[in-house]
Regions:
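Beta1/beta-strand and adjacent pyrophosphate-binding region of the FAD-binding site
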Residues: 4-21, 37
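Glycine-/small-residue-rich beta->alpha transition segments that form the dinucleotide
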Residues: 42, 183, 199-201, 205-207
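Aromatic pocket-lining residues of Rossmann-like dinucleotide-binding sites
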Residues: 29
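Glycine-rich, N-terminal phosphate-binding loop of Rossmann-like dinucleotide-binding domains
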Residues: 18, 60, 181, 206-207
Length: 207
């Protein structure tokens, strides 16, 4: 797609996808003072993150400590790589494991997510009990809290908006997106074409 003569909207950061990854990116971007839009092709936000069990594998939680469970980021990474049949990127897996407690605390303190702090569960494939569960037992709790936080901080949410193409300049730098608003799943030709410029970054966090 060619660079349009005119952009319809401009934001510092354009996030594609409103699941856990996209929501988190939007919260952090707006917290840093960036203008931000979240683009979601479906009529509701959250995607598959809404239907997970609201579980998070975390090492070093107060619940583990109370129960005397010995755990470590290294053991979590080992479990993840083994159960992923070695397909995971070791460096990325290591980062996820090392940041698990920090990420869990972020959902509590920044988003206000309520967790069952009386227990941890032994999820399949994990060597020890380290699964934290939301009080609601669903991932939608995290999504709703996160989207609410992002909007409070100035983020705009565009549902039923389909990304048709990523627009780049000749050198390859991403400039923005060609989207279709009013999109009717799964008809990729539906909706109205609009061009959204990203002044600083496009974050692809779609499924």
């Amino acid at each position: 797609t060619k660079v349009p003569a005119k952009w319809d909207e401009t934001y510092d950061v354009v996030v594609v996808g409103s699941g856990l990854a996209g929501m988190s990116a939007a919260v952090e971007a707006t917290a840093a003072g960036a203008s931000c839009v979240i683009i979601e092709k479906m009529a509701i936000v959250g995607g598959n993150s809404n239907i997970n069990a609201g579980a998070m594998a975390v090492t070093g939680t107060p619940m583990q400590q109370k129960k005397g469970i010995k755990d470590s980021p290294e053991l979590l990474a080992e479990d993840m790589l083994r159960e992923g049949l070695g397909l995971g990127d070791p460096a990325q897996v290591k980062l996820v494991a090392e940041k698990s407690l920090e990420a869990w605390e972020w959902t509590r303190k920044t988003l206000g997510v309520e967790w069952n702090e009386q227990t941890v569960v032994a999820e399949g494939g994990h060597s020890v009990a380290r699964g934290c569960i939301t009080l609601s037992g669903t991932g939608s709790t995290i999504i709703m809290k996160g989207i609410e936080k992002a909007k409070q901080q100035g983020a705009k949410v565009m549902t039923r908006t389909y990304v048709e193409d990523v627009i780049r300049e000749e050198g390859g730098r991403v400039l923005g997106l060609k989207v279709r608003t009013g999109y009717k799943f799964p008809d990729a030709s539906s909706g109205t074409v609009r061009y959204i410029r990203a002044a600083k970054a496009v974050v692809l966090a779609h499924g």
